[in-house]
């Protein structure tokens, strides 16, 4: 039976604004996820809940230096956690907390798994691990065992929450197609990617992510081999402990888009030109202003021509190519035997060369229909539809952030959920960038989408984003929250930060409370799993 939060009656001695605020507070405190906070009706006292450690640094909007300050005095694993990107994106094969615990325990050796944090995070992790131990205050609970600790080598580990078997904790998924979603005139190339799962043991739920082990661009690989003076067919020992040809290593195993500091140090040590060697060393040590910034391996080989390391030495120093995660855009109840993704193909100019995103262009350009691609499912523990099918949901997902909400709507339709659905979507131009327009328009017409608000930033002189549409609908948003609505955000970190600020301002204004109280209200919703984010 669904839980219905109490509502302040209209004849109660409160103003309309006071009633709205109280209704919202009651819905947040006593709603479906918060009912456990209500006073127990049993005479016997409830057992005291186990203390849960707070992580004040676990916020991607907080700067790295401030995150480290907030973790001062904590156990080493907590300091390591504070150095990470705080996105819990799973690209490292862990969550931020469990990756830090694995590093602290020694079960994980690689410092470069935090893809969003990049070299900045890796360098801080290295400093923290190499620093002498200092007195810390203990964690309030024992750290969870690092996932896959019983396996030897990070490449062989199977991470907690992954579904899949075989090499690198994966199972083969058959690539089917990558249809372009943008129309003519768009500046973007967004693909609707479909994998067939009928010959694999991969199974997913809405809210999960799909991990893809992509291959590096063949043209980039051949250019690197040529600059190194190597032979693609020669066998090398790979950084993941395997042995294969140089071409295969640079294509499937090594991260050549983001050379590790260790690889840059190898180049520095093998550059007879003193100026080049010093500049490479500055890059490896992360000195501000060291050039070229954000260079891939070919950039470095072109910029520092005297650096000619032995091929095996360089390959051993490169990092392992990490999988890329994509929010799943389908419900298995609606598209049996398939998984759908929404992928923005990344292409840009850098250092005088055309650059490509590793996984996005692999899916958009190079994956062949029917090809088996190593893949896995990353379980979502904190991005799930409410179990109460009558609960309303508000989804905010511009651009490719709309992917999980396409899945949510398919799921709600499949299970016959009666709760109202509200989608905020935005992109550049309506004529060319309204992703899944026909589907969402049909859902709006037939009532599955009770509300559909659109923000196309470049269709008018002033830029308009989803947070502007949210402010225009402030009163109704507050009303939905007062009725127990669940909030979901998916998309880029900067967008999520702006939306979070807009939500706090809306709640403060409509609820007649301070901004600080509004942020506390949002934090309460998050604790009750009524405010969930999938941010990258």
Residue ranges and their predicted role:
Residues 2-10, 14, 31-61, 123-536:
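FNR-like FAD-binding dehydrogenase module
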Residues 65-67, 84, 107-111, 423-426, ...:
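Short beta-alpha connecting loops at secondary-structure transitions
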Residues 20-29, 34:
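Aromatic- and Gly/Pro-enriched helix-to-coil junctions and flexible linker segments
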Residues 84-102, 111-127:
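Local cysteine-cluster metal-coordination motifs and their immediate loop/turn environment
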Residues 67-79, 83-88, 174-176:
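C-terminal accessory/binding modules appended to enzymatic or scaffolding proteins
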Residues 57-78, 120-121, 125:
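Short, charged low-complexity linear segments at domain edges
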Residues 80-87, 99, 204-205, 210, ...:
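Amphipathic alpha-helical packing elements
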């Amino acid at each position: 039976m669904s839980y219905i939060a109490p509502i302040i009656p209209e004849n109660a001695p409160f103003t309309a604004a006071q009633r709205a605020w109280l209704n919202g507070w009651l819905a947040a405190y006593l709603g479906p996820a918060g009912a456990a906070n209500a006073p127990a009706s049993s005479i016997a006292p409830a057992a005291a809940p186990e203390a849960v450690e707070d992580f004040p640094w676990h916020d991607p909007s907080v700067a790295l230096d401030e995150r480290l300050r907030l973790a001062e005095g904590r156990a080493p694993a907590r300091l390591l956690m504070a150095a990470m990107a705080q996105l819990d994106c799973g690209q490292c094969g862990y969550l931020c907390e469990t990756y830090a615990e694995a590093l602290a325990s020694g079960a994980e050796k690689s410092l470069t798994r935090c893809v969003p944090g990049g070299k900045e995070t890796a360098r801080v992790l290295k400093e923290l691990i190499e620093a002498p131990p200092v007195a810390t205050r203990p964690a309030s609970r024992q750290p969870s065992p690092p996932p896959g600790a019983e396996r030897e080598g990070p490449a062989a580990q199977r991470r907690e929450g992954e579904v899949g078997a075989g090499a690198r904790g994966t199972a083969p998924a058959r690539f089917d197609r990558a249809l372009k979603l943008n129309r003519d005139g768009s500046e973007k190339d967004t693909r609707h990617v479909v994998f067939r799962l009928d010959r694999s043991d991969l199974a997913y739920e809405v809210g999960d992510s799909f991990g893809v082990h992509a291959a590096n661009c063949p043209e980039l690989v051949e250019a690197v081999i040529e600059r190194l003076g190597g032979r693609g067919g020669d066998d090398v020992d790979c950084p993941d402990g395997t042995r294969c040809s140089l071409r295969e290593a640079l294509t499937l195993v090594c991260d050549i888009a983001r050379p590790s500091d260790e690889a840059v140090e190898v180049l520095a040590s093998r550059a007879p030109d003193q100026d080049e060697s010093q500049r490479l060393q500055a890059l490896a040590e992360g000195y501000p202003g060291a050039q070229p910034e954000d260079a891939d391996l070919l950039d470095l080989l072109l910029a520092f021509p005297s650096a000619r390391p032995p091929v095996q030495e360089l390959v051993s120093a490169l990092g392992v190519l990490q999988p890329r995660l994509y929010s799943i855009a389908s419900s298995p109840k609606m598209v049996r035997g398939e998984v759908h993704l929404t992928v923005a193909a990344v292409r840009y100019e850098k250092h005088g060369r055309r650059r490509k995103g590793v996984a996005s262009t692999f899916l958009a350009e190079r994956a062949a229909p029917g090809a088996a691609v190593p893949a896995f499912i990353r379980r979502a523990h904190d991005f799930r539809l409410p179990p109460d099918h009558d609960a309303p949901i508000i989804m905010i997902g511009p651009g490719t952030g709309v992917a999980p909400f396409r899945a949510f709507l398919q799921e709600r339709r499949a299970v016959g959920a009666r709760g109202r659905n509200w989608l905020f979507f935005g992109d550049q131009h309506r004529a060319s960038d309204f992703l899944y327009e026909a589907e969402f328009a049909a859902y709006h017409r037939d009532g599955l989408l009770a509300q559909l608000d659109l923000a196309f930033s470049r269709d008018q002189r002033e830029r308009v984003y989803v947070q502007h549409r949210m402010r225009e609908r402030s009163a109704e948003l507050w009303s939905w929250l007062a009725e127990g609505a669940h909030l979901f955000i998916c998309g880029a970190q900067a967008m999520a930060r702006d939306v979070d600020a807009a939500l706090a301002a809306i709640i403060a204004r409509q609820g007649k409370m301070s901004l600080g109280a509004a942020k506390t209200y949002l934090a309460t919703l998050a604790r009750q799993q009524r405010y969930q984010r999938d941010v990258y």
